[in-house]
Amino acid sequence: MPDKVAKGHSRTILIVAGMLTLAAGMPLGISAQTRKSRLPDHVPPKRSSQIKNGFGINSDLPRDPYLPWSRWWWTRIFDAGVSWIRIGQYENSSEPTSWDWVEQKRGVYSISPEVEDYVNSLTDNGVKVQVQLLYGNPMYTSPAGRLPDAITPEPGSFHNDDRSLYSVFWPPKTPEQIEAFTNYVKWMVNHFRGRIHYYALWNEQDIGYWNPWGNPEEYGRLLKAFVPAVHETDPEAKVIYGGQADPTRDFTKRALDTCQCAAGIDVYAYHTYPGYGRNLNPETMDSGAYGKESPRALREIVRRYPGIRPDIEYWDDEFNSIGAWKGSDDSVQAKYIPRGMIYNWAAGVRTFVWLLTAGTDGNEFDDFGFIHGLRYRPDDFTPRAVFYSLQNTNALFSDTKFDPSIQIPTPDLAETHPAKGTPFLAYGFRSPKGKAIVAYWLAAHSEPGNKFPADRIGLKIVNSGIKHPVLIDIVSGEIKPLAWKEGTTDVLDSVPLLDSVLAITDEDYFDWPVLPESPSSLTVTAASGGAQLKWEIHGGNPSGIEVERQVAGDGADSAPWKKIAQLPGSTAEYSDTTAPPSSRVGYRVRASNDAGESAYSNIVRLTF
């Protein structure tokens, strides 16, 4: 992430005075009252396995001792309905998928068995993976006059800017260095063929992750070699123009001019942290946060660049606005994240939020994690409020498409509210089944302490097809029934207006089954006559627990998984006495209920 975001109905509004909130309730017609008992009271979660095309998250891979796989954080990816993940950085350092880990001796490439398990856990549980291929390797890219023949990766506490002699932020620049890097790229793409399909070149190459500082011509020359290295190794693989830190059009244009490979780029990625270090609302990404630059203008120059694919995708693959920044807190973050995600979604941009869980041995403490990291405190590995905002956004808006035919005219409002002049944003989307959902909010600067003066407005929603409207608070997940104004099918007399996303949809929108949360914290120990397994059970009313075992041959962890036990849903341990001797055995568990199965737990292994 950097040391420093979408197009819809944006109109200036004038707001009726008042202090009513969603929690204070709303007038309900008779039909709304009779429907209330049929509605869920909160947004039912949707798991990753239930989503085809949704939002993404960045995550460090598990790493002891600060991000142990045996704690309850990793499986929350699947429980929260995350559809995509971006891996390749441990905080602001390198990861076991990085060049300096994969090639530690010249010409010798390897991935640890643990990383294989992490990647398989993601893909087996329905998450699509993009991996960043980065950074330099001191055996090739160090400016030293004498280069080592072997290296040991540095601990995860290092970070940019780092111009020390053997820093990994010295990039490949010479033909020999570029050839060495593309050898690593080809090996990675071939190794993960069939499991990983998206490969990004570098991370924030326009700032201090590229020594001595971002250089578009140098990046363009590396990109020119990267594109064929990926596509020729795996014709099904996709190339990502690695996430640019700032929406600077000149950097992108110069890189593409040098590369002359525009037709080979499948995804263009950039990052947004409007007002980095201070509270600045996400919509300013296109209206002042970056001066004359903006993500919208950046996408336009890419779209018009000669040779660019007409179907190129745009990803904002790092976005956050954290509570630790000046003038902010966790309540502000919980509002801003859905606002940014939906603002992007309406523009056809997929958002990957930064970051799942903080590795606190990095250089940014616990600041960015949607789940707290290890600080030896009671709330270690517990979610911040923003995690539930993310989960609700995933459940409601994943797999939807922006529908410009759904119109939400600007409400006719008075001039007495403190936020007068603030843009009102409203977007209509449709699910794969054609069901409409509308998101609306006031694009205001949110204050710490959830102090926004809430109001009520009349709202007209044209061409939605919604018959029995309900109101959803994205931050809290609360659902309440509404009723159309008598004699109309598109006018709501009085709905809340907030600085957080509210959604209106039909009462039958929530048509997905609620699967159990995944068991977590699986451990295995050798016991008399076998293996002793223990795990933690979570929500979703599990009625059963399935235990699966993998017996690996010849040291490989690619053998099929087989179910060895079906247990009652409250069971949290199991003793396996049937594992074959002299074998390496893996275990995983999942929960089930009448609706289906959860994601799998973490994987544990034991050698008999």
Features from the language model and the residues they span:
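Pro/Thr/Ser/Gly-rich low-complexity, intrinsically disordered linker/stalk tracts
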Residues: 512-542, 581, 596-608
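Aromatic-lined carbohydrate-recognition surfaces of secreted/lumenal glycan-active proteins
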Residues: 199-201, 223-252, 304-322, 349-361, ...
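Carbohydrate-binding surface patches
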Residues: 412-465
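Substrate-binding cleft and catalytic face of glycoside hydrolase catalytic domains
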Residues: 80-283
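C-terminal beta-strand-rich structural cap/linker in extracellular carbohydrate-active enzymes
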Residues: 483-515
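Glycoside hydrolase catalytic-domain groove-lining segments
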Residues: 273-326, 350-359, 379-383
